[in-house]
């Protein structure tokens, strides 16, 4: 049986504890004043997607949302992947990237499994409750948004407009 030097073990534990404290302290300093992060807020009833940086509006887009039989989930999620020219997979088969693809030219997957922000092969659906729960966008809008967000971007899907979002949307209408 190997003997353990209690004194050196205690010193090692103390050094590790101090190092852990210093790392946590440094992390707190680094994140005390984080840069304004971009976030997406979708008003499902208004069928609008707002891209914000802090409380500053960067863009407002018209979108399609889930129909009543397949509603858009509500809550706070994050973008977990970004896929240019996605392949659409369904029980009936796959659709390669292109004009017939129901996902359009871009896919931004959400932390709500199976849901995302994507394009459409039915542009007339924008502004309507027409999807299977995802948020659909016009091709040009989608491609612009895709370049402005990253994996980790916060996405809030609201079933009822918040005070902030109501104010933003009413100001956008009056401009």
Regions found by a protein language model. Give the residues of each.
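Cell wall/extracellular polymer interaction/catalysis modules
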Residues: 21-76, 81, 97, 106
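Short, solvent-exposed aromatic-acidic interface loops
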Residues: 63-67, 85, 121-123
């Amino acid at each position: 049986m190997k003997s353990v030097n209690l004194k050196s073990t205690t010193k090692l534990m103390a050094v590790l504890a101090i190092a852990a404290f210093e790392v946590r302290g440094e992390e707190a300093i680094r994140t005390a004043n984080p840069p304004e992060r971009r976030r997406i807020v979708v008003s499902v009833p208004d069928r609008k997607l707002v891209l914000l940086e802090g409380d500053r509006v960067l863009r407002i887009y018209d979108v399609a949302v889930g129909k009543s039989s397949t509603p858009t989930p509500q809550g706070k999620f994050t973008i977990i992947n970004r896929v240019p020219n996605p392949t659409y997979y369904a029980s009936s088969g796959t659709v390669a990237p292109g004009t017939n693809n129901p996902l359009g030219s871009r896919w931004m997957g959400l932390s709500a499994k199976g849901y995302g922000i994507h394009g459409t092969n039915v542009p007339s659906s924008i502004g309507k409750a027409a999807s299977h729960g995802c948020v659909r966008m016009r091709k040009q809008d989608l491609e612009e948004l895709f370049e402005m967000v990253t994996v980790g971007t916060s996405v809030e899907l609201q079933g009822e407009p918040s005070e902030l979002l109501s104010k933003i949307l009413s100001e956008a209408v009056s401009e």
